[in-house]
Amino acid sequence: MLHTEGHALLRAVGQGKLRLARLLLEGGAYVNEGDAQGETALMAACRARYDDPQNKARMVRYLLEQGADPNIADRLGRTALMHACAGGGGAAVASLLLAHGADPSVRDHAGASALVHALDRGDRETLATLLDACKAKGTEVIIITTDTSPSGTKKTRQYLNSPPSPGVEDPAPAPPSPGVCTSPSEVQLQTAGGGRGLLSPRAQEEEEKRDVFEFPLPKSPDDPSPSEPLPKPPRHPPKPLKRLNSEPWGLVAPPQPVPPAEGRPGLERLAAEFNGLTLTGRPRLSRRHSTEGPEDPPPWAEKVTGGGPLSRRNTAPEAQESGLPSGLRQKLSRMESVELDTPGHFCPDSPESSRLSLERRRYSASPLTLPPAGSVSSPRQSQESLPGAVSPLSGRRRSPGLLERRGSGTLLLDHISQTRPGFLPPLNVSPHPPIPDIRPQPGGRAPSLPAPPHSGAPGSPRTKRKLVRRHSMQTEQIRLLGGFQSLGGPGEPGR
């Protein structure tokens, strides 16, 4: 069978052949190489049984000098120090391993350290060496006790002895067993065999109880006895809290505390308890930004709702107007007559005004209807028949105290159009009014325009009404005015 160098090194170390192991290491073998179980050459040297104990110490020293690591663990978690303690390597081998950095506090997968393995082996010298190493590293002294399990096997336990806290008084003096070990020489080792077999079972139980140390839990000196009831701390009333930006449903009045029902009969006490569970009345919450609820509407809402139905613009059919009440119809006709009774408009009693109002109603019923091509109408009628024009129905929305003035040149164009019956229909009762002189003056001054006639006395309420101007002049009126100025020039080529 062919063996690799690692396995050859393990076989050479296991058989105690130091010279062969030296040749293998000098030939390039790795000192920390392990087999399938994770066992290294150093572990094999600690477990081996040599005829001469000095050969084991010499082999371990040589491997450590070649760089072997004493803290490498195998598949079971055991190190070379554990193998030395369990295999009876002796105190010399343990000292060599500890001198090269072996840790005595490391535990294997079963939870046993090198101290436990040394105690199971019963090697006092090795155990003392391990305790000295723990003390040199500043580790607390470890107390180990051996106990027999109910099945009859030995079971070793390891405890960490910590000094008692200050202020704790022992009620009874401690037994002469080693409570706190000051040196390894004071540690008493006891195993399951030996003198225990000569004692009675009851004496063995007492001795086992004495070996296992029990550390009482610290108690405060002013700790009251369990028979005395603990006084309840005083409960302070809860502080009133102030809600900031809370929800409306959280603004509920806190329930009033119910007085104690002591001294009352059974039924009254039960009724008081049930009454304490009822919720108190909630305050009425005011609604903001909501149209629901029985609250009174604001005064401006009464003014809005108090008015009549709103008229539609350019889409109101004539049938709807005929279906209005007689009182509302008279009011609307009065408002229309007041609007039409402005400077440049007809009198409400004239036949021309009634004919014009009928034409306005017919053309304003639909924004897309236009007069026939053969009919001749005035510019004002053609303007109001357009979709963008304002129908007389839309004028009813305005207050009767506000009158409109559509342009600054309206009166002048009306007077000019009165003298040209072939261009526009007559708008005045007088058939032949004089043509105003609109030619430019020789001095360069602008021609003076006639002032609009007053429709009433200075003190009449009609003259005090406010005139609303939408725009100064319309494009059609400006074009007509420019044409008349060219016709009324000094040469008068058009005549």
UniProtKB/Swiss-Prot annotation:
The modification N5-methylglutamine is found at Q15. Residues 147-495 are annotated as: Disordered. Residues 223-232 have a biased composition (Pro residues). The keyword Repeat applies. The modification Phosphothreonine is found at T315. Residues 203-213 have a biased composition (Basic and acidic residues). Belongs to the ANKRD34 family. Keywords: ANK repeat, Methylation, Phosphoprotein, Repeat. ANK repeats lie at residues 4-33, 37-72, 76-106, 110-139. This is Ankyrin repeat domain-containing protein 34A. Methylated at Gln-15 by N6AMT1. It comes from Rattus norvegicus. Pfam families: Ank_2. Residues 147-162, 180-191, 375-385 have a biased composition (Polar residues). The keyword Transferase does not apply. SMART domains: ANK. SUPFAM superfamilies: Ankyrin repeat (SSF48403). Residues 485-495 have a biased composition (Gly residues). Residues 233-242, 462-472 have a biased composition (Basic residues).
